[in-house]
């Protein structure tokens, strides 16, 4: 991964109608903006995007891309599995309850591997806010949605964006 990959990804997402925001490079995974609420309502301008990421011929060295979920990004929603076991459990439960068709449609979504888990993205007309769907016995969230007004770090983010330093990887699907 290199900053040019990040610039290309930020630009491609922006051209696809996604509200893109820069990510802090301190392991917090938070937006690198004083305030980012306005980007829950409007997409950044091309000038703002270039100000955050630079140009292909003159990259600013950013290592992270964030997407704002919801209507501002054309109805984008994310199903966030915080670890690989959570995804396996989800798949097993769906099959156990006879939801193989639904599981197939969900798994056909755009998929990214995160440093610890998996993100599935799709667009739909009606999106609720962020929702916790499953937690372990200690109360740690294992599966949640990132919906209206939510925010997600996406591929090809790498380096200090995540506390582990592990990159986010697109499966290209």
Where are these predicted regions, by residue range?
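Signature for HUH/AEP ssDNA processing cores
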Residues: 1-116, 124-126
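DNA replication initiation modules
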Residues: 70-87, 123-173
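Catalytic phosphate/metal-binding cores of nucleic-acid and nucleotide-processing enzymes, i.e., regions
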Residues: 120
């Amino acid at each position: 991964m290199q900053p040019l990959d990040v610039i290309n990804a930020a630009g491609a997402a922006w051209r696809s109608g996604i509200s893109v925001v820069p990510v802090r490079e301190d392991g917090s995974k938070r937006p690198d903006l004083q305030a980012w609420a306005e980007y829950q309502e409007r997409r950044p301008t091309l000038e703002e995007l270039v100000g955050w990421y630079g140009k292909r011929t003159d990259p600013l060295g950013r290592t992270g891309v964030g997407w704002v979920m919801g209507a501002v990004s054309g109805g984008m929603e994310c199903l966030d599995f915080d670890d690989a076991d959570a995804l396996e459990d989800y798949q097993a439960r769906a099959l156990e309850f006879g939801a193989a068709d639904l599981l197939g449609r969900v798994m056909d979504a755009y998929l990214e591997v995160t440093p610890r888990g998996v993100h599935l993205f799709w667009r739909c007309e009606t999106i609720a806010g962020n929702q916790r769907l499953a937690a372990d016995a200690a109360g740690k969230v294992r599966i949640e949605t990132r919906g209206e007004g939510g925010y997600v770090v996406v591929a090809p983010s790498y380096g200090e964006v995540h506390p582990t330093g592990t990159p986010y990887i697109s499966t290209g699907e």
